[in-house]
Amino acid sequence: MIFVFVLCFILFLCLSLLLRPLILSISTYAWLLVLVLLLWVFVGSPLKIFFCYLLFLYLPMMCINFHAQHMTQQE
């Protein structure tokens, strides 16, 4: 189950970074949030949930932010 989640996560993250329109990128990332919520059902301890938050929410959101800044500098 975790392998499928990680595979979907990586695919959605790459897709959201490759999309030029920021709103579409954030929409794709919203699907990632749904995947993270599904993962939290299977993960038990608070420490694991914290690491999942860092890995699957905070870091990708930072990447999307950098992507948006890069797109605004190109225009």
Swiss-Prot record:
InterPro entries: Papilloma_E5_alpha. It comes from the Viruses. Belongs to the papillomaviridae E5 protein family. This is Probable protein E5. Keywords: Early protein.
